[in-house]
């Protein structure tokens, strides 16, 4: 016998109780009145003649209300068609709509977004039919074969770089597929895209009134657009620049985390995708012959061809395409076993996990390994069982509880079984010897470490710092002594040359090697030996900043610059304003030390010396930068006071930067016992005009006119500001093929609108949109009938009256019909056909193009099908001549290539904003100029 709950569920679905619930929630008063009336009619059916009076009164009230309230619309009367609700907006931190890979929470604030498995591997749980996957793979293979391999094979036969490019392309395609699944396509098309189409039709209608034939329609419409013309239509060069800019804006969302840090890879992908893929696709889509073909497909009412082949099996998205072709393993690749076997690598791996907020993932793995070693002992005493039971409780509370900050996402059955052991008697802990829960939890975490964090570590700065600095452990370096360092001592790849010997000895850890910056004039070519800097080499008061053997954590320090004070400079014999820095150290409480505090006085220039040294060691910090240094002008008390807040914020950001958490250089800057000469401004001298004017006459007297000309030239050169460094090389080609000019300039589009640069146009008025808001398929139908087909006034008034009764019903039907058509297009054999057409359009350039006669034949067929698509009753209502003129106008509209391209880019902007709503919140200037009237 079936379950009564399932039977009631079937009855509920059959009677559509959910629909009645929605109606009751939306119209509570009307629903209550109708419920009372229907109940009274059923119960008191012998008094039906009396109840008819109330039914008539109710019908009259509703009719009178609807007549006096044109804004009121009757709900959809097609019960079988239910409007699809838009998906709720996903949390910005997790754009793919999945929970955190570590703790499982959907709004995790602890872990970084890169920890999201679907963000790092978006093809997870994404499967497509094998035929569709093969078609897409074929197109992507042609992209590589035509635009990458021709020049790459001249450099090397190694496929490693192309394999990385394959992974990046797979990532890009998977992100688009995931985001497309979240978009309510019928709603977007019927709302935003149809509004854009109505605007386009309005422009065409106004332009047609100004020309006598279709030859000048395109130019008149472009002029009518005015400033609303899409920026990509100004010229072919602007079109290419727009696609480049759009591609760069999408890089952070469609490429793997930190992939854009590699500028060369980003430029390569941008140029290949922009010039060789996106531009030909836009040309293909806007081609009138292509538009005619799409119109024929859409209005074709013939039944679809029966599918002869059975559905193909589902396969992981682009898995075969992304399979590495090279058989050689990278020498830089690591696995988790190698990391754990080397103490220094393990230390750096833990530092990396700390930056990612995932140290507890590795800690869980180590804890379970130790726990398994103990619980698998055959003879366990009661004391050992109690201790193991306490450990199980701790594991559950730390890694399984929802409110725990170290929660790891496990399957529910794992959490339930661990919970049952933790809450049960301690003797039940031996069940874990045979239960699957702990073993599967361990396998899950181990897979997380091996498949996600280990590859991320191999691409991290921490790992490459290990490769550069060798295998010396920072903890072991801190035990060395300055006197034991010998000239010429180096490690790792720092043996390459003596000129860079001191650079690779630097590190941010305690006991790092810092190069000597005090350079003697005239010895620019010499390379000084690096000096070991230790806090414990200083006298007793140095203990306030560091303790031998204790790892420093600058992120636990707090600083402030409360005021600006004066300092007596014994050399210059004057009082100099300095910043007073109050420092509080709180990172040694776990070893028994109380909070320590002191004050440090630093000059204005010393901050810039610190920034220069940190930049040389670690590169620039984009989130922590000093304001521009004042070179000429007084640096008095008032000036320093105005900069106090900015300098304080700069130091606070440095302290919280993970890479500087144990920086010796930053600790010395905040220490009152650092070397006096360490932050002198010899590397950043101020421009002293007085010294220049005093020194030049002396040099001229000393030279006595000898070699005066080269001296004056060198003097002028020294007074000029340094020339700016050349910017990053910018690729300006489409692709390394001979077809560049053909793709950028062709006979169909020529130079697009061919507008001169800097031309400003005023916005044209929109007479229709200012009078009435057009919303929904019913309003679009009325607008097209009024503007395109010039329907008579009586029909317009009739449709306006019927609008109250049928607007929502018609729009529900149109949405349902569009969804049905979309599902037909998304069928396997049709998707394969569409991808094949795209492949032929982009890559089959050597084959014969369609002849003008073929295009003319298709255009004629399109016009005839458009005429036949409208029912005969339309011609009877508006007249056959008006019907012919309206269809002719719509047909002429899609025969203009530049107008098609304008519409294509407008629709592209809408699609991009729907796929990537983050761009709408942080919309950059120039992304879209066509959304003003949407």
Swiss-Prot record:
Family matches, as Gene3D superfamilies: Phox-like domain, Regulator of G-protein Signalling 4, domain 2
PXA domain sequence ranges: 129-303
Annotated transmembrane regions: 27-47, 48-68
UniProt GO BP: autophagosome maturation; autophagy; cerebellar Purkinje cell layer development; hindbrain development
Main location: membrane
SMART domains: PX, PXA, RGS
Location of this chain's protein in the cell: Lysosome membrane; Late endosome membrane; Cell projection, Dendrite
Name used for this protein in its record: Sorting nexin-14
Originating organism: Danio rerio (Zebrafish)
Lineage: Eukaryota, Metazoa, Chordata, Craniata, Vertebrata
């Amino acid at each position: 016998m079936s379950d009564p709950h399932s039977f009631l569920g079937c009855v509920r679905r059959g009677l559509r109780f959910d629909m009645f619930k929605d109606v009751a929630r939306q119209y509570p008063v009307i629903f209550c009145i109708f419920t009372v009336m229907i109940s009274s009619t059923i119960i008191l059916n012998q008094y039906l003649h009396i109840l008819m009076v109330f039914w008539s009164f109710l019908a009259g009230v509703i009719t009178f209300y609807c007549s006096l309230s044109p804004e009121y619309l009757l709900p959809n009367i097609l019960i079988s068609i239910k409007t699809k609700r838009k998906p709720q907006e996903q949390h910005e931190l997790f754009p793919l709509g999945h929970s955190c890979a570590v703790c499982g929470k959907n709004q995790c604030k602890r872990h970084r977004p890169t920890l999201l498995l679907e963000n790092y591997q978006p093809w997870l749980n994404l499967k497509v039919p094998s035929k569709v996957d093969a078609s897409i793979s074929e197109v992507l293979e042609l992209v590589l074969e035509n635009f990458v391999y021709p020049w790459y094979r001249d450099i090397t036969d190694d496929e490693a770089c192309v394999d990385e490019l394959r992974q990046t392309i797979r990532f890009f395609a998977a992100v688009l597929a995931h985001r497309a699944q979240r978009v309510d396509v019928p709603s977007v098309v019927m709302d935003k895209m149809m509004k854009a189409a109505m605007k386009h039709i309005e422009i065409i209608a106004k332009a047609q009134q100004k020309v006598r034939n279709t030859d000048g329609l395109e130019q008149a419409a472009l002029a009518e657009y005015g400033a609303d013309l899409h920026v990509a239509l100004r010229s072919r060069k602007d079109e290419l620049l727009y696609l480049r800019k759009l591609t760069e804006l999408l890089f952070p969302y469609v490429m793997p985390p930190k992939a854009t840090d590699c500028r060369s890879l980003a430029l390569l992908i941008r140029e290949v995708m922009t010039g060789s893929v996106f531009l030909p696709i836009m040309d293909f889509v806007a081609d009138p012959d292509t538009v005619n073909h799409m119109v024929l497909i859409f209005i074709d009412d013939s039944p679809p061809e029966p599918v002869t082949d059975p559905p193909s099996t589902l396969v992981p998205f682009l898995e075969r395409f992304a399979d590495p072709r090279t058989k050689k393993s990278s020498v830089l690749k690591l696995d988790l076993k190698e990391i754990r076997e080397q103490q220094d690598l393990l230390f750096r791996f833990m530092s990396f996990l700390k930056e990612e907020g995932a140290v507890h993932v590795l800690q869980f793995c180590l804890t379970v390994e130790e726990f398994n070693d103990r619980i698998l002992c055959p003879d366990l005493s009661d004391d050992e069982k109690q201790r193991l039971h306490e450990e199980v409780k701790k594991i559950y509370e730390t890694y399984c509880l929802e409110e725990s900050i170290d929660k790891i996402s496990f399957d529910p059955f794992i959490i339930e079984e661990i919970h049952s052991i933790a809450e049960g008697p301690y003797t039940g802990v031996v069940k874990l010897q045979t239960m699957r829960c702990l073993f599967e939890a361990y396998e899950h975490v181990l897979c997380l470490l091996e498949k996600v964090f280990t590859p991320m570590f191999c691409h991290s700065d921490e790992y490459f710092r290990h490769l550069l600095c060798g295998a010396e452990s920072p903890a072991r370096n801190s035990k060395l002594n300055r006197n034991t360092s010998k000239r010429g001592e180096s490690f790792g790849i720092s043996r390459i040359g003596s000129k860079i010997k001191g650079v690779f000895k630097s590190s941010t850890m305690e006991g790092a090697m810092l190069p000597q910056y005090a350079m003697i004039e005239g010895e620019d070519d010499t390379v000084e030996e690096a000096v070991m800097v230790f806090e414990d080499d200083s006298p007793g008061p140095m203990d306030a900043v560091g303790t031998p053997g204790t790892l420093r954590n600058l992120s636990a320090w707090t600083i402030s610059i409360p005021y600006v004070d004066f300092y007596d400079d014994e050399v210059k014999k004057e009082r100099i304003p300095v910043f007073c820095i109050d420092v509080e150290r709180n990172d040694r409480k776990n070893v028994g030390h109380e909070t320590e505090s002191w004050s440090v006085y630093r000059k204005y220039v010393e901050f810039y010396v610190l920034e220069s040294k940190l930049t040389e060691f670690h590169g620039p910090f984009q989130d922590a930068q000093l304001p521009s240094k004042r070179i000429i002008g007084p640096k008095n008390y008032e000036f320093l006071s105005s900069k106090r807040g900015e300098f304080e914020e700069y130091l606070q950001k440095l302290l919280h930067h993970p890479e500087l958490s144990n920086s010796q250089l930053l600790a010395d800057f905040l220490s009152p016992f650092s070397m006096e000469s360490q932050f002198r401004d010899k590397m950043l001298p101020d421009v002293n005009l007085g010294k220049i004017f005093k020194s030049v006459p002396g040099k001229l007297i000393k030279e006595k006119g000898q070699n005066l000309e080269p001296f004056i030239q060198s003097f002028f050169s020294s007074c000029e500001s340094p020339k700016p460094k050349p910017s990053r090389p910018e690729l300006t080609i489409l692709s390394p093929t001979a077809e560049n000019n053909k793709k950028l300039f062709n006979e169909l589009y020529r130079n697009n609108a061919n507008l001169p640069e800097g031309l400003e146009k005023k916005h044209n008025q929109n007479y229709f949109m200012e009078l009435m808001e057009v919303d929904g398929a019913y309003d679009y139908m009325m607008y097209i009938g009024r503007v395109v087909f010039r329907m008579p006034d009586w029909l317009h008034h009739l449709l306006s009256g019927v609008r109250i009764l049928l607007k929502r019903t018609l729009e529900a039907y149109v949405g349902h019909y569009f969804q049905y058509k979309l599902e037909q297009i998304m069928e396997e054999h049709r998707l394969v056909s569409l991808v094949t057409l795209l492949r032929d359009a982009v890559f089959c350039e050597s084959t014969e193009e369609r002849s003008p006669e073929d295009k003319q034949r298709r255009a004629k067929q399109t016009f005839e099908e458009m005429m036949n698509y409208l029912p005969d009753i339309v011609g009877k209502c508006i007249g056959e001549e008006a019907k012919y003129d309206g269809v002719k106008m719509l047909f002429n509209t899609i025969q203009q290539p530049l107008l098609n391209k304008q519409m294509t880019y407008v629709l592209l902007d809408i699609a991009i904003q729907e796929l990537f709503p983050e761009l709408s919140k942080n919309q950059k200037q120039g992304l879209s100029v066509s959304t003003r009237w949407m």
